Amino acid sequence: MNLGVQYYRAPFPESKYWENDFKAIKEAGLDTVQLWVLWAWVESKPDFFNYDDYDRLIEIAARNKLKVVLSTIAEIQPHWIHRIVPGSEMIDHLGNKVISSLRCECNFGLTPGGCTDNPAVWERMAQFIRKTGERYAGLGHLHGWDIWNELRWNVQADNLVCFCPHTIQEFHLWLDQQYGGLDGLNAAWKRRYVCLEDVAPGKLPDRPYTEMMAWQHFITERANRHAARRCAVMKAIDQVHPVTAHGGCPSADYRGWDKGYPIDRGNDWALAETLDGIGCSSFPQWGGIDDAEFGSRVEMVKSAANGKRVWLSEVQGGRAAVGFNIYGKVEAAPQQRWIWNGLACGADTILFWCWRDEVFGRESAGFGLAGRDGLAPQRLEAMKFTGKLLAEKAEIFNHYIPGSAEIGILFTPQNYYLAWAQEADGKRMGDAINGYARSLVRQSIPYCFLEEQHLDDLQHLKLIILPRSIVLNDYQTERLAAFVQNGGTLLVESECGAFGREGFYRYPEDRFLAQFGIVEAGRRNLETAGITLKLDEELFLDIEQWVTPLEESVNAPVQVFSTFNGQVLAAEFKAGQGRIIYLGSYFGNPYLEKRNPNFESFIQKVSVLAGVKPAIEVISPAPSRDEFIYVKSGRSKGRLVTYLFFPGDDCTAKIKFSPELLPGSAKLTELMSNQVITLIDGIATVKPGRFKMAVLSEA
């Protein structure tokens, strides 16, 4: 386990601070520093590479017994790039040449710079990565590489990019591979092109979906490929140290906007196939991210990593500042909870942004872990405690593996592409996923995220939730049908699979659910803001957009939960050896907004129906709208380790462990306070050890 901090974004902090800062970093319980190795700074003159400042920083780190993470910032390009590679500028969707400029938070270098589909630009970039690897791969205290920071490539492009000839050529090659040639594309798109060169990418939303969705998909794949190419350059030099990359958020939270496509920085699941690990940035206080959202955020990254390394690559160090505004306080206790939340999800490296307050541009006077917001002493004291505990209990934490889940939530990028093709925004789709995830986090029901192209291993799951999954293709429908036929449970919302990846609408009888005798009658206007579901109790749930009742079918429902004008609106159906829970509207989005506890009760009942029974249950206190007990667990060399996150220091929780997990009278040690807890009939009474949380280990 490594706990560190970002330090240097050239040329700041200035060299007069380095010696004392690195000593203070070590004294604060941190063991790693991250340095931004900027292409523009290192190669300010073509083919001359100056690493003098990095050499000195790395030497100071070694003297202070600090490991080093090197972040290759190749996306901040040299000022000479367009002079040495003429015509390398990106082109926007209107045909305009993109004028690069200094990035808002970086003092030297151009962004977005030249298009990396231009071979000459890529070779220049690859040379920088290669030179950096050759210089530092042999360091004894190198912890690893962050090969691509926040997966940035189009920042400050000021419009949709890139439509340069090189990228358009790559798009045509990609289409050729996707569809097996022009005939396959014409058949799928229902067009009559005479050559691939005539196929134009989608230009703007609210126009035909087909080419717009394909173009967005290509842009995602383009970023995936670029990450793989960066990684390959470094791996050719360094096969010892991990090569990771991180996004500004998990890929499922890139919803797009009017000047950027959703998931345009790559798909974490695809990135993890070639990298050694995946990370993301998180600024919880600045972004209003509470425990539930932070928990699902880290779970997204862990799920995508698929057993590879999980890094929290940028975590908020101090108070945020943008321009002449400051935002809230970063106090010690919540910051420590971010660390332990990451650990509970299996993160092995956590890096804070940053050590000192920034001094450049819009971020001036912000973000410093040791910054001058009045709270640095408490933050550093808390960090020292955590660093010491991680060192003392390294045998436990270094071998910790999170427990597995029996529930999966499906993330479908094609949903985002369709939504953006119409609305220039994939927010509906992201919120739907996060609504269901939040309901599970608040009940401490383990779950994972699934991605639409990674559904080959579903045997360990009992329940798969498909939030707003309006786009499904053959691969997904085949895997999901096999899952339910073999005994799994699917929870689906309205118009599941109503579109294919080409953006054509399917009639209800042609959709995924029709094979199980579940056929929607069509969209009906909302008459109320919610419906009552009748299970073993009546639950009023909020809904939105429309309702889609079902036609009568030979597959009669096992249970009818709700009706609309005499037609089934929500029900349980038998399907092979499994079952399908059909909901004829959208429930996750309004729950995320209104936090109706009845939705949580419904999800818990569906989980039980699917055969899911969490091995650890929170007996008390019951969650309120804003407060809840959050539990994560796993094992370290066979020993159970359980993390509890409390709403307050004065809270006491009763936690029940299943007999399969622990004997009914087992003893646990709370590692922060060294308190020994004896289970009574499998129930532990637990108080926070520190930071409104507890870490329990088998005694």
Segments predicted by a language model, with ranges:
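Short, well-ordered coil/turn segments that N-cap beta-strands
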Residues: 1-3, 29-31, 62-68, 138-143, ...
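The substrate-binding groove and active-site-proximal loops of carbohydrate-active enzymes
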Residues: 3-14, 36-52, 106-126, 160, ...
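Short, acidic/polar
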Residues: 12-27, 125-127, 131, 257-271, ...
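Aromatic-lined substrate-binding rim segments of carbohydrate-active enzymes
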Residues: 19-27, 31-100, 130-133, 229-237
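Polysaccharide-binding and catalytic clefts of secreted carbohydrate-active enzymes
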Residues: 92-294
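Hydrophobic targeting/anchoring helices
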Residues: 205, 244-435, 522-527, 534-543, ...
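A short, well-structured beta->alpha microelement
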Residues: 438-457
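A conserved amphipathic helix/loop scaffold
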Residues: 459, 467-699
